[in-house]
Amino acid sequence: MIDEPGGHREVVLTHPRSPTERAILQSWAEEHHPGARVLPVWAGTEVPSALGEVLATADDGARDTVIVPARVTWVTPESDEPGAVRRLRGLAVTAAMRMAWSPLHPAMAHYRPDAARVVAGEQATVADLVSRFVAQAGGGPGSTGFARFVARQAVLACDRAERKVLGDRYKVPRRMVEQITSSSRFAALVERLAGETGSPAAEISRRLRSCLHEMAAVQSPPAIDVFRAMMGPMHQKTWDVVVDESGLERLRELNRQHALVFLPSHRSYVDPLLFAEVLHDRDFPRNHVLGGNNLSFWPMGALGRRAGVVFIRRSFGSDTVYKAAIQEYLGHLLAKRFNLEWYIEGGRSRTGKLRRPRVGLLRYLAGALAERPGLDAVLVPVSIVYDQLHEVGAMAAEQRGGEKRAEGLGWMYGYFRDQRRHIGTARVRFAEPIPLRRALDEAGDGPAQLEKVAFRVCAGINRVTPATATSLVTFALLSARDRALTLQQVREVVAPLADHLEAREVPVPVAELRTRHGLRMTLDRLAEAGVVTIFDGGTEPVFSISPGRHHVAAFYRNGALHHLLLRALLELALLRVGDSGEGEDLVEVAWRELSRLRDLLKFEFFFSTRREFRDEILRELDLVEPRWRERATSPGDVRAALRRAPLLVAPGVLRSFVDAQLVVADRLAALGEDPVPAEQEFLTSCLGVGRQMLLQHRLDRADSVSRELYGGALRLAENRGLIMESDGLGERRRAWLGEVTAVIDDLGRLGDLQRARLEVVLGTGEEPAPVRTDVEGDSDVAS
């Protein structure tokens, strides 16, 4: 060490992995820090005693000694080029240079001397490092952990410097478990858990360390490149990807101050792979993706963990230590500003619309913030939507009662094979970011706090989810009720849907819906997937949903239903207003009906607050009848407004869900006062009864025979107190059945009007007749 002109001394702390790197670093130090002492900390070895000796002099007044971290970074040919590593040769070169295998260093330095770059981390005095160590670990410069702490800080400083060369996409955590377990927070956590559980502190410490090692992702640039190259075939050829670039740039600015928690919708196994590639290509740091350990089989588990996947046990019951480990790990990641990602629905949607959110991980995230008052995280709702998915057929089979195939190597091979065919576009869009602390405050205290935050995330996803051509075309064909339509007839059915969505400022693919060529391409893709049948043996081709493929078509249709939900509810409410007697308050009738429908469907769709819901309904009414305040003064006026409306969507939007409720309500009513069997047994019986009722034409929609829809109806029944034994249970079950039957009757009346419209489109009918008014006993649906 030498004294600098400013009176301080310098120590260059290097991290060589080979004699070649040591020579490069020594030469660099002599040029840039002449006379400074160079201390190598070899990878995988203990901190050298010489560093401890240097730091020990801090007690003798040498705290102005400056530590200069430095290491060699091998820059690959692809470092400045975004995009996946696609060729095996490129992968081999990139992986070799990223791994920087020490036996290759002499050859790499000889043939590619420009590839070896020395990166120097931010310098710090020993005094600064002592202050940090005291704050984080509670020790002093003389403690045994101080030298390890300094070496760890040097590694992190070099990581930050390296990212300026390689880009933010290779921001990777280092020694996370060691950082967590060496902190004063960890010691306090062990003491608290020992007191709560009555277990010895040593046992708690061992279990916590084991849990942290089990879940912690150990990212490395070589593993990331290998993982991307291996997983690329699962999505690269399948879709063209369209990204909300402006939304992502806003997030980049936010990420400079806060960790981001990406919460995407979940439709496919490839969601995290495709989303990771979107971020990688735009030089975003790689997310820590929290996923179930059902996907941790070889080689996914080994590679995934090194590429940022955090495998969480799918169930851990009352394991207090494991829960504490998750919370501590998440909090540490946020504190270090590493971004997170998980899928708030808890699994892939089997119906095509957002599932009810799971709040378990959100609870641990909120707990981590509560323990760190100066920390915040920003939730980012993300919509990932596909024109088509190869895996929809398998998910549809599960809903009809089929078994889910277990994930493994055989499953992966089949998935790779299926993904080789191009099937359209994937769209990634970002909703308004939500600061978590503010969201928790606005949700208020109480047991529903986290659920309100999760619903807010889901509402954000729905708002930015575009309506795809596939969703609107399948909506039109399913609404035709197994009738085949010509291309022009499909256009005429789709046009009012597209008009309505554009009036609501919902993104719609104009080129695919407004032109014959675009619409035909959409139908041809659906035909290639077996969803649509094309018959061209007559005067012109006609299109219909293929037999047995209604669940698949409904999956695509359901992706746009949230944009049509308010319209559907309003149509039903107006129908009831049209049934009102003279002298009734029409506005009161409408709001009463809307409130009832909202409660009936609250486990299937996401609704805004009641005040916001009222404003949304009024805006929707302006689209249905712009002069409703002047013209809707009597029930007859309202019935006339329904006849004039260019679009009726309620049967297409709601019938499947209400049909599913009918099956569950019918089974509960049949039980009388008896208890409900175990959930899975009950749902299986509903599948059988649902198939029977469909064959008897007591149900209108084949896609209503669905385990997931029956599950939603069962949650509603539980919410209404129709599961557990109580006074008047049988009567209340029958009352719910009557309520559902009445809604089905209303949908049937609107369906009559809708079918009359379709006959006009087909050229086989006249203008719709007046709306059929409600007459007691009019329903043709047996209970």
Which residues fall in each region the model found?
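Membrane-interfacial terminal anchoring regions of lipid-handling membrane enzymes
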Residues: 1-783
